[in-house]
Amino acid sequence: MNKILKGDEVIVLTGRDKGKRGKIAVRVDEDHVLVDGVNVVKKHVRPNPLKGTTGGIVDKTMPIHQSNVAIYNPASGKADRVGIKLLADGKKVRVFKSSGEEIKA
């Protein structure tokens, strides 16, 4: 079970975007995520007449390693760690480590 999922609000812990918050848009692979408005770079794109695209400079969101983000706890207003709790019926749920409160998906 992944501890950080698509749609979670996260805080960036390291890098030039440290402290920024955003929602996870996509899990690129097992270790990388795309966070809305974070790690945006300028990409130079060549024109392609076959596809009908014009060239120029485009803002593009790049992946960030999931170890560099932490889930945002709205109760405390800070970054928090995620734990897995086993319920009585055998279901696994994600909880905030600091409060033990269940994370709403």
UniProtKB/Swiss-Prot annotation:
Give the UniProt entry's GO cellular component terms.
ribonucleoprotein complex; ribosome
The GO molecular function terms of this record are:
rRNA binding; structural constituent of ribosome
Q: Name one GO biological process term.
A: translation
Which Gene3D superfamilies does the entry link to? 2.30.30.30
Q: Which UniProt keywords apply?
A: Ribonucleoprotein, Ribosomal protein, RNA-binding, rRNA-binding
Q: Does the keyword RNA-binding apply?
A: yes
- InterPro entries assigned to the protein according to its UniProt record, in alphabetical order: Rib_uL2_dom2, Ribosomal_uL24, Ribosomal_uL24_CS, Ribosomal_uL24_KOW, Translation_prot_SH3-like_sf
In terms of PROSITE patterns, this protein maps to:
RIBOSOMAL_L24
Q: Name one Pfam family in it.
A: ribosomal_L24
SUPFAM superfamilies noted in UniProt: Translation proteins SH3-like domain
Q: Does the keyword Ligase apply?
A: no
Q: Which NCBIfam families match?
A: rplX_bact (TIGR01079)
Q: What family, per the record?
A: Belongs to the universal ribosomal protein uL24 family.
- What the protein does? One of two assembly initiator proteins, it binds directly to the 5'-end of the 23S rRNA, where it nucleates assembly of the 50S subunit. One of the proteins that surrounds the polypeptide exit tunnel on the outside of the subunit.
Self-association or partners: how does it assemble?
Part of the 50S ribosomal subunit.
Q: State what protein this is by name.
A: Large ribosomal subunit protein uL24
The record lists the organism as Leptothrix cholodnii (strain ATCC 51168 / LMG 8142 / SP-6)
Tell me the lineage of the source organism. Bacteria, Pseudomonadati, Pseudomonadota, Betaproteobacteria, Burkholderiales
